[in-house]
């Protein structure tokens, strides 16, 4: 088996280097805990010696960072590599930059000082004209920003809600949701922009906004009740197969969008007869069309029934 893996590794331009492959192989083949500890200790000593050296290529630096992550996965301290992780986030190569952001999110605890060092990098990457850099930075917002960093990044996140590219707008909505979870007052001045996202031309962007609005409505439902007619209209369009078939699952149109809409309607219609009356017809149609005998259909029916039990009764 090991020879087969060696042949595969040597025959491919794998994303991992030979040294890392040999490390994983050696640990996997170790006969005792003592032997495993010896291998890990030797690896740590090697990394501590080579990481401070200058002149590493981005590719080599990424591999060394990955090896330090592997050391941490095995229960050892890999903090000696954290500064190099921050450097990797500044790489001009998108793949290495993404690796740096991911490594930082996995290793730097919320109170770590190196997170503050990444704020400026995140801001610069969000302003990039490269879509992938922007989405990578927005992922960094979701994973690395803490409550005290929110004011520094929220302005750039809000601007990206109007980006030309759909994936960037979707990521921006997700990042804004995370900022709201960290600081509920941070989005208070941007409700109008959040409302406009519901009407985004890309259903995936609109779907990302539903989770944010659901949390906002749970905190103050009165601010969002006026969205009920729009949400009902969107739900009706979905069940009538007006969305692209790309959103279908087992011939059920956009089932996860349907379920998120139903959860939101349940919150907005609770104890409100006027709002609830706007929902009765579409809820009945949702249950009728979803009852197809497959699991995802049952999930939609369940959410619809739950919504019915939450809103004002139809008397």
Question: What are the roles of these predicted feature ranges?
Answer:
Residues 2-14, 18-81, 86-89, 93-315:
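Extended alpha-solenoid helical-repeat scaffolds
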């Amino acid at each position: 088996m090991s020879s087969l893996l060696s042949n595969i590794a040597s025959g491919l331009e794998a994303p991992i280097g030979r040294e890392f492959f040999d490390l994983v192989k050696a640990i996997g083949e170790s006969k005792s805990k003592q032997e495993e500890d010896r291998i890990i200790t030797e690896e740590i000593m090697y990394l501590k010696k080579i990481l401070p050296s200058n002149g590493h290529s981005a590719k080599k630096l990424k591999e060394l960072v990955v090896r330090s992550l592997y050391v941490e996965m095995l229960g050892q301290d890999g903090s000696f590599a954290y500064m190099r992780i921050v450097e990797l986030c500044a790489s001009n190569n998108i793949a290495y930059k993404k690796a740096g952001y991911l490594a930082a999110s996995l290793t730097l605890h919320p109170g770590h000082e190196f997170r503050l060092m990444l704020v400026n990098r995140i801001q610069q990457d969000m302003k990039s004209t490269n879509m992938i850099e922007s989405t990578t930075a927005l992922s960094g917002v979701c994973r690395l920003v803490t409550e005290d960093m929110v004011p520094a990044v929220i302005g750039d996140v809000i601007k990206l809600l109007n980006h030309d590219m759909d994936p960037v707008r979707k990521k921006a909505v997700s990042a804004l949701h995370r900022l709201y979870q960290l600081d509920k007052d941070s989005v208070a001045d941007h409700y109008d922009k959040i409302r406009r996202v519901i009407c985004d031309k890309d259903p995936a962007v609109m779907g990302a906004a539903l989770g944010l609005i659901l949390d906002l409505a749970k905190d103050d439902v009165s601010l969002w009740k006026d969205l009920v007619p729009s949400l009902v209209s969107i739900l009706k369009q979905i069940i009538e197969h007006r969305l692209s078939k790309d959103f279908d699952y087992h011939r059920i149109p956009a089932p996860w969008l349907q379920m998120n809409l139903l959860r939101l309607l349940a919150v907005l219609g609770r104890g409100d007869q006027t709002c609830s009356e706007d929902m009765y017809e579409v809820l009945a149609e949702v249950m009728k069309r979803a009852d197809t005998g497959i699991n995802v259909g049952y999930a939609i029916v369940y959410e619809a029934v739950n919504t019915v039990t939450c809103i004002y009764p139809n008397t």
